[in-house]
Amino acid sequence: DVFPLPRILQLVQEYGQSEMRRPVEIEFAVTLNQQKKNGTFYLLQIRPMVDVKANLEEDLNLIKDKDVLLKSNNSLGHGIMEDIQDVIYVKTDGYTASNNPTIAYEIEKMNRKFLDEGKHYILVGPGRWGSSDSWLGIPVKWPHISAARVIVEAGLTNYRVDPSQGTHFFQNLTSFGVGYFTINAYMKDGIYNQEVLDTRPAIEETRFIRHVRFDKPLIVKMDGKKKLCLLYTSP
């Protein structure tokens, strides 16, 4: 053969599936040199495939808003989670981006406890998670939030930042099946029912964040094709 394309594609898919822990789809290009009888393979894109076996039968828009804790019309992720009872969220009263480095440290400390206990949580806060510019978001690294199963960017009226849509952690999100929600409730784009969180007793509370636990597991449903995700309480 002039160019072993089948073998190259096989290796790319094997390595991609191993790293992302699910089947992948790729885009590629090849240039061939007929005189030298060789060529160059260019990998343009590689991304995880939506698992059709996890297709959601129901229409998530039919779930009543009054029962919803979080709703995003612009999200990343696909599937159903029914085993998470904990939420860590950034307090919004008096929030200012100047405190973002401290908030990152407080979250890192709580995350360690979840790792020690082998548990997971939902993480909610304003701005771009993982931004290197702390004025645009909370500057956490992936190890600081690695026990989170859903990460939410919740915009505020007085703190409006273009969403990152998970770009800072894209490989980790896809590899570990973590959901990423973008919500701007002040623009009527999605739902963030923080009042429900505020009324629950805190398992742990710091100056800037709260950790609350629900009596029953929360239900997370993510439709990757429609980019629609919901999180609501068990009946």
Annotate each PLM feature.
Residues 1-25, 29:
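A long amphipathic alpha-helix within ATP-dependent nucleotide-binding catalytic cores
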Residues 23, 53, 58, 153-180:
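Phosphate/diphosphate-binding loops
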Residues 141-151:
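Acidic, Ser/Thr-rich peripheral helices and adjacent loops at domain boundaries
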Residues 232-235:
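Conserved small/polar residues in nucleotide/adenosyl-binding loops
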Residues 3, 48-120, 125-126, 145-147, ...:
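C-terminal active-site "lid" helix and adjoining low-complexity regulatory extension at the edge
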Residues 28-37, 120-136:
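A glycine-rich phosphate-binding loop feature that marks nucleotide/adenosyl-phosphate handling sites
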Residues 22-48:
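Conserved metal-phosphate-binding beta-hairpin within the catalytic cores
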Residues 35-43, 55-58, 133-138:
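Short acidic, glycine/serine/threonine-rich loops at helix termini
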